[in-house]
């Protein structure tokens, strides 16, 4: 409904959501955790671009990995062709976005292991702070697991890609999460107003 009523940001065909995880290892961003079910190449490109902008908005430099069950085409027969194609498009058309994949989560989050096994990767020496998942099932399962395990303070879902500030909550959203999302909505509204007035 939000997509039809509010519309998508210019230059995109899809919107998404992300969650912010504050952990002992630092802050991480996960997308897309609530909207797109089985991501096509086009959807993955839009999700990566929107997430890149959002992470920068939160004053972090996005180092992004598209995660899967295989690494850099190691399973050519059943590998995630959508991720391969999305990575190719992002590297070609959006070179400012530092993204690589596909790779398993352990290689995304362990740069020593990643760089030793795959020295050709474009993230050499860098710590990944942003994970893009191949589908909603994987993304939502991971963040729900971390939430229940108490492994991180989680903020979200934060919508990215709609024309106006809007955020979603579920029936079991905590008061703290509602306060966090309300704060973000106010900030988003102020930014939106300033951008609108400049036009």
Language-model features, listed with the residues they occupy:
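Anion-binding alpha/beta catalytic cores of soluble intermediary-metabolism enzymes, centered on
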Residues: 1-81, 85-199
């Amino acid at each position: 409904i939000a997509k039809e009523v509010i519309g998508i940001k210019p230059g995109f065909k899809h919107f998404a959501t992300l969650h912010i995880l504050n952990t002992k290892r630092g802050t991480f961003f996960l997308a897309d955790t609530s909207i797109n079910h089985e991501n096509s190449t086009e959807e993955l490109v839009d999700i990566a671009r929107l997430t890149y902008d959002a992470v920068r908005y939160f004053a972090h430099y996005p180092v992004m990995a598209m995660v899967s069950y295989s690494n850099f085409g190691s399973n050519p027969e059943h590998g995630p062709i959508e991720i391969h194609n999305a990575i190719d498009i992002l590297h070609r058309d959006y070179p400012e976005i530092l993204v690589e994949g596909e790779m398993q989560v352990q290689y995304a989050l362990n740069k020593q292991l990643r760089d030793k096994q795959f020295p050709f990767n474009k993230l050499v020496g860098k710590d990944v702070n942003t994970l893009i998942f191949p589908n909603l099932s994987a993304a939502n399962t991971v963040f729900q697991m971390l939430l229940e395990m108490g492994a991180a303070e989680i903020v979200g879902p934060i919508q990215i890609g709609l024309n106006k500030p809007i955020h979603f909550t579920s029936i079991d959203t905590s008061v703290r999460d509602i306060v966090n999302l309300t704060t973000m909505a106010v900030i988003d509204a102020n930014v939106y107003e300033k951008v609108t007035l400049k036009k």
